[in-house]
């Protein structure tokens, strides 16, 4: 979340990547020493793609440029089982630099969840069901990032890289479903086990060309990227020891990206920029369901489907910046993006095409009051496009009584964003960075829950089946205040805090149900690094998230603390580190969902304390 908004766009080396989209575990498995820096951009200029109404998070992967042969090696071991080894190597001789980052990991991630659902039966007594899930994800994999930089001359360079990621996991989830009476006495029990195998691999090829046209900063760059990904997942579900269902899901993805930017300084205080960008994506999902018929798993053609999703984004931008009296700075830009989508259900020959064009103006202003004090203002228009899972209309069974179904007619969400910022730096190494922001979004995408009118029989009891589906429900207004404080005392103490307070207002109606709601929430982060006697570094990370509420749900807040101790050895050529994640063993999430037909109370644990 960025400022309480889950619509931030994550980039790898300034470009979109399937590594983030398909295999969300990639970010979690990426070792810290493979990352050079992380850029957070809350008011992007027209140079950046318009995707991401919550801003941009850009992860820059490390590539050392030191002369000669250089390298580092890192090994980790932890409990619950967690082991990894990673390396960073580069060799530079004259005009050519070769670099490599690699990592190999093997770990277990336990988790659990529990919930109770009450179904209202009019004048009849309510029906109660509880669910208790225990899961264990055993994952292993590796990634390799190889590349080169060729400095052809003082003004020309060529960078090429190849990234390969291989991920596999074996997941076991045990779900105990109990029918209860109004006094919570158990009437019936059924146990479901879900055995899931998951294999993902991704190949990414990158090429970057940069040419300085003069010594005043005139520059042209060209970026090319090609990716192909494959994901295979098999899930076998048994009930009370008897196989009841099997699901095979194969996803093949291919994407291509090209971008070119031109920068032209005009005098000492003006600059003109322009660029183009084309991005394409082609995903095919083969989803097959097998049911137990006479103790034989037979494909259910009514629940199986082949789904194709194609997307092409064509964009162009221009922006002009000027600095006046070394005090005022202005950056004005305009970006246009055309999106062409094809949503195809190949099994039933159902095709949908969506063509959308949007204009995205940006304006950024800066006032340098003194060398230590700055005021900023930013405006931008952004877009959030629904991704492939949200537009796939074919139902996917989550549990016997819960279905997910996408919506092929979803429109993108457009947002207008305003940001006021103030930065004050003190000579005592104390910095205040604060901002007030406002965002208004139209056609906001929300997930609703409805009854399908169908029932599932569980231990002889007919239980209503509900479906979760995304719709363009509402207009959303978000107003917030953010305060960042940082203090550095030499090399021995460094502390950073972030406090975010925001109000969210939603207005929307669907099927005569009013979803209007106003909610105030907040978050707090602290990162404190202190050098103890013996040159032992002690780092504390604290995260607090306030409660949240919508018209049909409530979620509790979350609190966690991570600790780390490190000591440099062998004349600072090696480092020994101890990490403790979730010190109090309470990181999790609790949510209540309610409507006229049922009430659900659900609690989820992300994992457990680890070291």
Residue ranges of predicted features:
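C-terminal beta-signal and adjacent terminal beta-strands/loops
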Residues: 567-611
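N-terminal periplasmic accessory domains that precede
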Residues: 23-26, 52-73, 85
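Transmembrane beta-barrel wall of Gram-negative outer-membrane proteins
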Residues: 81-112, 125-172, 197, 201-203, ...
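Short acidic/polar hinge/loop motifs at secondary-structure boundaries
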Residues: 15-42
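Outer membrane beta-barrel strand-and-loop segments of large Gram-negative receptors
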Residues: 246, 255-259, 301-305, 407, ...
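Extracytoplasmic beta-strand/coil segments of soluble accessory domains associated
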Residues: 1-19
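Surface-exposed extracellular loop regions of Gram-negative outer-membrane beta-barrel proteins
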Residues: 230, 296, 340-342, 371-417, ...
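Outer-membrane beta-barrel signature, preferentially recognizing the C-terminal barrel domain
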Residues: 305-312, 354, 383-433, 440, ...
